[in-house]
Structures are given as structure tokens and as C-alpha cells.
């Protein structure tokens, strides 16, 4: 069977499964919540409490979770049966998680190594993450250079009691950032005894090693003794997975064997940077400066234009092109990794105490460490200048050269007394008498210098609170939180600008045989760059609630409260001296104090009708204020059916990266020149479908957007509403359906017309016309940096490398969809119980309304500029089926589904979603990424008094990630947000836990 036939078969199987899933797809139902939220791991000695709880999104205790707002609850029992072992995977499995979701597998973004959720696809900045109802410090590096979020990797998993996901706006309760929804991770309140778990596993390919251990110990019967103390620790390690280990198509950008495009020019073009150096003779206008190479090629017409240095060192064969012979490389296969090395550990503790019969208190402390080690492709010798540096330091424009002469000092070598001919320059001897005409322009990748980063993130967090009651009338609470997030980022392999000049002029670096270079030479050329950054949050919350009087349906309750919160960020510039090629200059600084007052009123008007109203006023020290109201209702005409709905307004305050006057960044997105440009530069095909034809200048490259903070920005605002039904015709089955609609206005965007600016640039005939065309797009748009000219077509328009764009409040976005859920809980026999829970989200619309038209994202790769550019799948869902055989044995199958995605993105220039706008450039071919289904199987057996042994097979049927050729070049042909399990493949895990 060939690959194409196999792929067609997989599509048929996936489509059939999708049809089956779509008939049941849902989000956790209200009845399921009442059944599932009771923590299966609660200790037998836990204190007895009443059956009231506080559900995320309300200030009141209530007897059930059937609030007017849709809430999904993930219990530890559900997560264990799904084989999930960290908070990131748990939360990102929610079907409401959409575009902009960040997984640890996305390693090339600004905040690589962090993980975040993006509810409703509105971005990580529009999702509020709480721990026990309180905020935490944001990850010190902003996603996409400006989006703020809490790193999910920093939250201890073994202490999780349950995770509640509120899927509508909640600014009226929690303030800023809750536009898309709220994730509240609830940790254990008390624990008595000793509990531990050990887990290990391996992928079927022999890698992706996984180890995890946790231990919790506690004492003090709170019910009888009035106190409880527990401590907890956990450790997790996950090994690397290379692209090479997963084979085609995840280890190459050459899809020509299945009818795609060959974007791997490292095995066919001598102007592609690779570990073999290629040189061609050019002029050198300043013999003391390697950055002053000329544009025109000076080789004789009857000689090859390019010469390979060290051609005899080729390990994968050679290729012959019209301009010379070179070594074959597939750089993705040789250097890239799918999963980084990850290590996490944490220590946590809590003291709960009763001050009196009416006052209770608690104190918690936690420390978590998350380490991520990323390997990347080695750095190259031709680079643009760092963002903010002078164009004169660019090594790509017109091109860095090896001089004819070298000397010990590296200064004025052409006239130095101790000068020698440059052994790295094959033209040196012939042009010893005329060194200005014998320079060797070089294309090279430092394959002997490992490139990557180590990211250590330490989060310190402490909370304390007192809760009590006054005269059986007023319930009050005061809670405080302090969180400090410290990040240490160590970058490896980035080339120092001055050191490169020195190494070239002294000849200390061997380009002919790089294996002979000493570690000292490599370290001097690419010293490690260490950058510390940190963020801090502290807040004090206080509220009181009171039952005012009794209505026909129950007690009318009122809650009022206030908050004061301080936040700060110091995200330091990794390249503050502008002395290193390719290293980002993104930075963000700021601090503010927020004061807020809020209220909530809950009125059970009748037994059949509950009405809820709330509001919050927030004032920011920057000078702006915002009032956020919310209204909700729940109507239950019969026990079998209920209707519910909410309306709310919310806001997202500008992040420090967006508004800080000292903040800046240059973000890069994979871009492919339009076909007309490719054809002009030697490509083949037509204006709709074209190929680079071996010219690397025509292939996908990184196009930057340069932007600085704008202190005049105003908050984003939102309007959202939900309407749904809860149906429970029989006790063992329930169903919910909720429609949501969110409008986010006054969006804070970076260059909303960047696509128009790029199109205007490429449509121009020369550089001056291109600069004028980009400037005509609007204020703040300009050409910052252009590439060196195409060596094969030096008289044509060069590519743009960075286009300046403004931060502005502009446009509005509307997203809508349907959440569905169903739960069945049947006792098949006296000893066999079957539980089936299914949840899913169907995205109806996701539209950005701009001055030039509507950008439609639903079911496409749009918004491509957001985070990992993994798009907005229309349908996501999860279905868990469990058979329990008495009390001793259970078998669970958890199925996850992601619908197909069209490889177009209307934020990339064209508002059309037709396949003619395929980002891959092949029209109808490869226009869709196929649906994806994975199945995780878990078998658990109880033993002794509290022991559990489990065997898990993740991705049991070894489903492969569907091919996504338009994905970012850093993740060739796959989508890390949705298809990660299909990259790792089948995994085997085993765990044993005990409790006593």
C-alpha cells in the first residue's frame, strides 16, 4: 500500500468516526457534574461538610453546580481514567480551548516552554486562570511578544481536587481577562494520612520516556481537632523526541514524493545555509570589514559560480547544480525535535485551622520548578541586524565575506606585517595582489555549534485567608495571595557579531573542516546568553454575603466585596546590547495597581425560576476604569428540562508589553512570497500554483513585524451571551446544549493591515516604490529592513524582512458556537456499571471585522499570526467510556477528536477562503488537514486498602498526525496544538498508587 492510499483510507476511517462522534458531541452536563465532582481520591478521614459548594463564577455556596452559566468540571477520577498526568494536558483537552492555545511542544514561540489555554479561541490573554479562586503571577515572557498568561506547567497536578471551567464571560466577578472564560484549579483543602503515586512509560518508538512520582502526607482531623496540616511533593520528567525518529513527513520539508512541494533546498542549492560552507567571489569595499561584500559575482563565465569548502566531508552524498557541487542535507531531519526535554518538581503545603466556632482560616505555600530544554537548528552566518540595530551590522545585506588576508590581531590585515593568505578563502592566492577583488561571499550554518535554549521557571506562591459568620446572618471572607514567577533563560549557539568579525579576520574558525574547531573557539564565537526575567502579583480580596429574605423559590442572597491588586513585569531584553545575531530584542516592563468593588445578587424568584445579577467596577492606576455587569437566569418548568442563559460585559486591560513605553518586540511569521514574485525569481508554474524551482530565495521564510508599546491604548471590551438547555428525561441520562456568542471590541492589535502592507510591498516594481506603498497603508506602517538581493536575480526587488506596524485599538471580533454534552450512567448488572461522558464544541463563526473586510477564521488556519498558527478547528470533542466491574476493576477508553482544518488564513492578505488561497501554494492539493482521532485506554485494579495499579496505552491505535504542509516551518507538516499525540505515537504507561 502506498502512502497516498494509506492516507485516503485514514481519511475514510476518520470521517466515519467523525460522523459517529458528531451525533453525541458534548460538554460535561449539569447532572454529570453533580455525579462527578465528588473527588474519588478524598481521604476517608476528611471532615464531614454540608453539601453546598462554591462554583466558579459565583460568590455563593449552592447545593449543585447547575448555575445559569455553563461550567465544565474535570474531576481527578475523570483525569486518571483519561491517563492525564499534568494540568496543561487536562485543561487544554477542554473542547472550548481554541486558536492560540499553547502547548509545550510549540518550541519556536516567544514563550517557548510555557503552556496556556485559549478559551473560545480569543487568545491566552482573554482567558483567566485561577488557583483556588485567586490569581497567580503571569509567565514572564509574553506569547507573541504581547499576550500575558499563567503558565499551566507551574501548577502541581497531584494536589488537584477538580478543575472547573466557566465558559462565559466573568469580568463581573473576577475583573480583567475573563472575556473567553475562567479556569479555576481547585486544590485539596484537607488531607489526612499518606498518599503516593509512581508512574512510568515509554513510547513504542523507544523514546518519550515519562516518569512521575508524588507524595502527600497530612495529619489533623479537622472535624474533631479543628486543624489539618499537609505537605506534598511531586516530580515529573519527559524525554526528548526528535523529528528524525518519527520519519516522513514530520522530518522534512520535502513533500515532492506525495505530490507536494520540495522546500528542502539544502540538498539542491548552494545559497542555502548548511553545515558545508559555500563561497563565491565578490568585491570587498572595506578590507577590514567582512560585512562590506559586494553584490556582483566576479567569477569567470566558464567557472562554477560557487565553491564548496570541505566537499570531502559530505556524509549524505552530494548534488550537482548549474552553479556548483555541494553536500546534501535535510536540516529538519538532522536537528529538529518534536518534544523537548521537560523536568518539573514542586513542594507544597497547607495549614487549615478553626479559630472559633464561627471563624476558620488557612495558610498555603508552594514552590514549583519547570525546566524545558530545547534543541534547535544551528545558527547561520547571513543574518539581518537585531531589531533596533544599525543596518550596517547586517551580515546578509549585501553579504558577509571571507577576506584574502588574515592576521593575528584581526585589524587591517591587508597591510599587517604578519598577514597570511586566508586558508578559508579559495580565491586568496589568485588575488593576493588585488585583495579587494578576491573576497569570498559565504553561505554557512554553524553545524558544529549546538543551538537551543534552557528555560528554568520558578514560581513561589503563598495564600492565606479567614472565613467566618456573624450572628448567623453574614458570611464573610478575606483572602490574600502573593505570587512571584522567576524565569532564567539561557540561549545557546547564537553568534556574537563582533566575535564573528574577529574570527573571520583572524582565521580562528575553520570553515573548511569545522570538526577541527576547538571548544574555546566555538564558545568565543557563540557565548551563552543568560537573561533573567520575573513577574509578581499580590492581592487582597474581601467579601460578605447575606441572606436578605425568603422568596417563593428560596433565599434572596446578596454579596458585596472589594479587591486591591498589584502586578508588575520585568521581561528583560535578551539582546539588550544588540550584539548577537538572530536573538530577539523583545522586552516588556510595567507595573500597576488595580482597585475593585463588586456585588452579586441571587434571586430564586420561584422554584422554577432563578435570576442572578452581578457587577464589578475596576480602576487601574494607568488612569482608566471599567464597570462590568452580568445577568443570568435558570428556568426549570419540569424536573426533566431547564433553560438557562447569561448576558455579560467584560474587558481585557492592555498588557505591559502592549502599553509599556519601554516595551518592544519584532515578531516573525512564516511567509511565502506570492507566485508572481516567485515566477520573476526563476520559479515555475503559474500565478496560482508555483514552485521555487531550486531557488531558496523563493521559499518560505520568516517575515517580521516590528512594534513598540503604546501607552495610549485603551482596554478591549466584550459583550457575551449564552443560552442553553439542560435535559434529563431519565435519571441515568442527561444532555446539555448551550449556544455562546462573544463580541470583543476595541481590539489591541499589531498592525491589522499587515497583510495589505505585505501585498503592497510585493506588488511594487522597486524598493523605493515598495517603501512608499507600505507607508500608504496607514500611520505606523513602514519598511524597517529588507533582505540582501537575490544572488541569482540581483536587479529585482529584494524580500522584506521586517515591516514596522503599530499597536492600535481597532476592529472587533465575533465568535459563536455550540457546546453540547451528554452523560449516561447505567448499571448493566449487579456488578457492572457503564459510564459514558462526551463533550464537544462546534465553532459556528470566528470573524474579525476590519475596515477592509471580514476575516473569517472558523475551520481554517486563521488567525495565522496568533501563537503557533494552528488555526481554528470547527469541531473538537472528547468521549470517555468506562466499565466498572464491582469495586476492584475498571476499563476506560477516552476518545479525542479534532475536525479538519482548511489551509487558508484570511489574516494573510486575502479575505477569500477558497483553496486558491492555500497557504501551501498548491491550490486544491493539500488544501485540507484531515480530521484526527486518538484513543487512550486505561485499565485500573484496586488492591489492598487504597492501592490502585493502572496500565495505560495512550494513542492505542497509533494514529498518526495528519499532514499539515502549511504549518510553521518550525513545526514542519504538523500542528502541535491539536495533533501532538499523533507525533509521539503509541505510549505505554504503568502506575501504582497507595493511600493509607
What residue spans do the PLM features occupy?
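Outer-membrane beta-barrel translocator/receptor signature
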Residues: 145-150, 157-161, 172-183, 189-250, ...
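Surface-exposed, low-complexity loop segments enriched in small/polar and acidic residues
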Residues: 144, 247-256, 296-342, 348, ...
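N-terminal Sec signal peptide and the immediately downstream disordered periplasmic leader
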Residues: 2-92, 214-219, 357, 462
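C-terminal beta-signal and adjacent terminal beta-strands/loops
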Residues: 734, 745, 844, 894-912, ...
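C-terminal beta-barrel architecture of Gram-negative outer-membrane proteins
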Residues: 666, 836-942, 957
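Short loop/turn motifs that connect adjacent beta-strands in outer-membrane beta-barrel proteins
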Residues: 47, 190-193, 206, 222-227, ...
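Periplasmic plug
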Residues: 111, 116-167, 195-198
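N-terminal plug
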Residues: 43-46, 54-110, 131, 136-143, ...
Amino acid at each position: 500500500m502506498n502512502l497516498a492510499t494509506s492516507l485516503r483510507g485514514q481519511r475514510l476511517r476518520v470521517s466515519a468516526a467523525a460522523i459517529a462522534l458528531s451525533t453525541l458531541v458534548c460538554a460535561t452536563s449539569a447532572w454529570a457534574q453533580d455525579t462527578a465532582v465528588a473527588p474519588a481520591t478524598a481521604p476517608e478521614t476528611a471532615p464531614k461538610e454540608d453539601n453546598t459548594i462554591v462554583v466558579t463564577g459565583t460568590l455563593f455556596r449552592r447545593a449543585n453546580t447547575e448555575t445559569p452559566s455553563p461550567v465544565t468540571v474535570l474531576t481527578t477520577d475523570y483525569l486518571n481514567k483519561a491517563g492525564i498526568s499534568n494540568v496543561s494536558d487536562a485543561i487544554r483537552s477542554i473542547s472550548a480551548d481554541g486558536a492560540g492555545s499553547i502547548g509545550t511542544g510549540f518550541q519556536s514561540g516567544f514563550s517557548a516552554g510555557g503552556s496556556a489555554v485559549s478559551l473560545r479561541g480569543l487568545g491566552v490573554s482573554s482567558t483567566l486562570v485561577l488557583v483556588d479562586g485567586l490569581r497567580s503571577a503571569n509567565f514572564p515572557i509574553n506569547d507573541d511578544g504581547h499576550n500575558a498568561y499563567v503558565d499551566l506547567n507551574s501548577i502541581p497536578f497531584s494536589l488537584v481536587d477538580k478543575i472547573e471551567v466557566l465558559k462565559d464571560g466573568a469580568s463581573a466577578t473576577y475583573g480583567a481577562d475573563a472575556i473567553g472564560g475562567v479556569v479555576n484549579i481547585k486544590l485539596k483543602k484537607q488531607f489526612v494520612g499518606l498518599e503516593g503515586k509512581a508512574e512510568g512509560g515509554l513510547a513504542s518508538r523507544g523514546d518519550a520516556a515519562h516518569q512521575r512520582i508524588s507524595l502527600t502526607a497530612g495529619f489533623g482531623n479537622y472535624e474533631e481537632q479543628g486543624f489539618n496540616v499537609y505537605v506534598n511533593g511531586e516530580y515529573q520528567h519527559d524525554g526528548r523526541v526528535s523529528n528524525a525518529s518519527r520519519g516522513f513527513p514530520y522530518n522534512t520539508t520535502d513533500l515532492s514524493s506525495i505530490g507536494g512541494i520540495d522546500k528542502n533546498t539544502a540538498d539542491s542549492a548552494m545559497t542555502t545555509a548548511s553545515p558545508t560552507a559555500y563561497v563565491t567571489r565578490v568585491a570587498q569595499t572595506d578590507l577590514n570589514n567582512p560585512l562590506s561584500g559586494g553584490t556582483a559575482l566576479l567569477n569567470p563565465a566558464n567557472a562554477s559560480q560557487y565553491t564548496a569548502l570541505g566537499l570531502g566531508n559530505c556524509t549524505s552524498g552530494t548534488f550537482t547544480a548549474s552553479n556548483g557541487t555541494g553536500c546534501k542535507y535535510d536540516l529538519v531531519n538532522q536537528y529538529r525535535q518534536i518534544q523537548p526535554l521537560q523536568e518539573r518538581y514542586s513542594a507544597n503545603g497547607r495549614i487549615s485551622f478553626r479559630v472559633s466556632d464561627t471563624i476558620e482560616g488557612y495558610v498555603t505555600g508552594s514552590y514549583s520548578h519547570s525546566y524545558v530544554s530545547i534543541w534547535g537548528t544551528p545558527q547561520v552566518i547571513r543574518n539581518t541586524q537585531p531589531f533596533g540595530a544599525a543596518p550596517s551590522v547586517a551580515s546578509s545585506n549585501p553579504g558577509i565575506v571571507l577576506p584574502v588576508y588574515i592576521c593575528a590581531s584581526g585589524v587591517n590585515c591587508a597591510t599587517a606585517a604578519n598577514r597570511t593568505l586566508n586558508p578559508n578563502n579559495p580565491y586568496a592566492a589568485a588575488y593576493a595582489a588585488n585583495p579587494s577583488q578576491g573576497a569570498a561571499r559565504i553561505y554557512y550554518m554553524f553545524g558544529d555549534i549546538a543551538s537551543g535554549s534552557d528555560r528554568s521557571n520558578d514560581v513561589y506562591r503563598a495564600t492565606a485567608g479567614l472565613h467566618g459568620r456573624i450572628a448567623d446572618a453574614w458570611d464573610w471572607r478575606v483572602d490574600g495571595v502573593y505570587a512571584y514567577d522567576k524565569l532564567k533563560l539561557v540561549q545557546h549557539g547564537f553568534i556574537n557579531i563582533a566575535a564573528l568579525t574577529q574570527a573571520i579576520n583572524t582565521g580562528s574558525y575553520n570553515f573548511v573542516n569545522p570538526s577541527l574547531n576547538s571548544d574555546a573557539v566555538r564558545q568565543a564565537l557563540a557565548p551563552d546568553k543568560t537573561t533573567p526575567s520575573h513577574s509578581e502579583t499580590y492581592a487582597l480580596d474581601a467579601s460578605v454575603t447575606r441572606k436578605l429574605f425568603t422568596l417563593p423559590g428560596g433565599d434572596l442572597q446578596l454579596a458585596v466585596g472589594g479587591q486591591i491588586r498589584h502586578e508588575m513585569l520585568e521581561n528583560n531584553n535578551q539582546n539588550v546590547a544588540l550584539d548577537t545575531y538572530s536573538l530577539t530584542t523583545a522586552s516588556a516592563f510595567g507595573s500597576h495597581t488595580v482597585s475593585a468593588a463588586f456585588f452579586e445578587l441571587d434571586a430564586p424568584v420561584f422554584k422554577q425560576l432563578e435570576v442572578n445579577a452581578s457587577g464589578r467596577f475596576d480602576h487601574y492606576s494607568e488612569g482608566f476604569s471599567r464597570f462590568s455587569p452580568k445577568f443570568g437566569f435558570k428556568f426549570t418548568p419540569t424536573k426533566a428540562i431547564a433553560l438557562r442563559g447569561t448576558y455579560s460585559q467584560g474587558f481585557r486591560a492592555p498588557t505591559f508589553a502592549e502599553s509599556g513605553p519601554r516595551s518592544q518586540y519584532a515578531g516573525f511569521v512564516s511567509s511565502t512570497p506570492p507566485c508572481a514574485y516567485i515566477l520573476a525569481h526563476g520559479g515555475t508554474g503559474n500565478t496560482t500554483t508555483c514552485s521555487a524551482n531550486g531557488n531558496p530565495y523563493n521559499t518560505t521564510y520568516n517575515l517580521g513585524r516590528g512594534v513598540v508599546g503604546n501607552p495610549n491604548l485603551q482596554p478591549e471590551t466584550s459583550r457575551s451571551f449564552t443560552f442553553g438547555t439542560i435535559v434529563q428525561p431519565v435519571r441515568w441520562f442527561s444532555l446539555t446544549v448551550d449556544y455562546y456568542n462573544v463580541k470583543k471590541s476595541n481590539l489591541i492589535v499589531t498592525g491589522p493591515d499587515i497583510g495589505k502592507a505585505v501585498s503592497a510591498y510585493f506588488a511594487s516594481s522597486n524598493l523605493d516604490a515598495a517603501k512608499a506603498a507600505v507607508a500608504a497603508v496607514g500611520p505606523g506602517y513602514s519598511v524597517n529592513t529588507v533582505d540582501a538581493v537575490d544572488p541569482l536575480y540581483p536587479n529585482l526587488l529584494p524580500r522584506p524582512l521586517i515591516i514596522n506596524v503599530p499597536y492600535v485599538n481597532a476592529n472587533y471580533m465575533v465568535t459563536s458556537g455550540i457546546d453540547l454534552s451528554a452523560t449516561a450512567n447505567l448499571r448493566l448488572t449487579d456488578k457492572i456499571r457503564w459510564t459514558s461522558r462526551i463533550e464537544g464544541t462546534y465553532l459556528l463563526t470566528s470573524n474579525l471585522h476590519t475596515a477592509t473586510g471580514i476575516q473569517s477564521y472558523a475551520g481554517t488556519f486563521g488567525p495565522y499570526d496568533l501563537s503557533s498558527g494552528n488555526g481554528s478547528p470547527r469541531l473538537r470533542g472528547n468521549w470517555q467510556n468506562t466499565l466498572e466491574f464491582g469495586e476492584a476493576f475498571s476499563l476506560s477508553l477516552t476518545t479525542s477528536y479534532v475536525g479538519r482544518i482548511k489551509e487558508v488564513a484570511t489574516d494573510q492578505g486575502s479575505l477569500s477562503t477558497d483553496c486558491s488561497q492555500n497557504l501551501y501554494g498548491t491550490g486544491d492539493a493539500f488544501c485540507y488537514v484531515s480530521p484526527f482521532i486518538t484513543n487512550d485506554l486505561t485499565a485500573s485494579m484496586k488492591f489492598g486498602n487504597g492501592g490502585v495499579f493502572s496500565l495505560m496505552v495512550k494513542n492505542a491505535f497509533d494514529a498518526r498526525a495528519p499532514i499539515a504542509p502549511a504549518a510553521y516551518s518550525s513545526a514542519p507538516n504538523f500542528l502541535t496544538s491539536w495533533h501532538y499525540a499523533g507525533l509521539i505515537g503509541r505510549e505505554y504507561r504503568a502506575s501504582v498508587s497507595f493511600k493509607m
